[in-house]
Amino acid sequence: ALVLLAFQVQADPIQNTDEETKTEEQPGEEDQAVSVSFGDPEGTSLQEESLRDLVCYCRSRGCKGRERMNGTCRKGHLLYMLCCR
């Protein structure tokens, strides 16, 4: 639930319209790293190592290796997949 909340701040809900699907596969677009942080200054349970080490990328051609799709991200009018490991 906490991971989902963090992605709602940075990612748009998945929408499968024809226009958005076409913009996902633009040749020459580079993957973009996204830093995701959890926790508060007082050190609550959100400081768990598994959450602190979450690394996400906005990818145009799908997730790689051990990454999972966790939503979408946008740059301008282009839609990318939010892939995290």
From Swiss-Prot:
Using the UniProt annotation, give all residue ranges assigned to the region (Disordered): 14-46
Classification via SMART domains:
Defensin_propep, DEFSN
According to UniProt, the name of this protein is Alpha-defensin 11
What is the source species? Mus musculus
**BP GO terms, sorted:** defense response to bacterium
Q: Where is the signal peptide?
A: 1-11
Coiled coil (UniProt feature)? none
Q: Which cysteines are joined by disulfide bonds?
A: 56-84, 58-73, 63-83
Q: Which residues form the propeptide?
A: 12-50
Its localization reads: Secreted
Bilayer-crossing residues are: none
Tell me the keywords, alphabetical order.
Antibiotic, Antimicrobial, Defensin, Disulfide bond, Secreted, Signal
The organism's taxonomy opens as: Eukaryota, Metazoa, Chordata, Craniata, Vertebrata
Tissue specificity, in the record's words, reads:
Paneth cells of the small bowel.
Question: InterPro entries from the entry?
Answer: Alpha-defensin, Alpha-defensin_C, Alpha-defensin_N, Beta/alpha-defensin_C
Q: Which family does it belong to?
A: Belongs to the alpha-defensin family.
Q: What does this protein do?
A: Probably contributes to the antimicrobial barrier function of the small bowel mucosa.
Q: Which GO terms describe its cellular component?
A: extracellular space
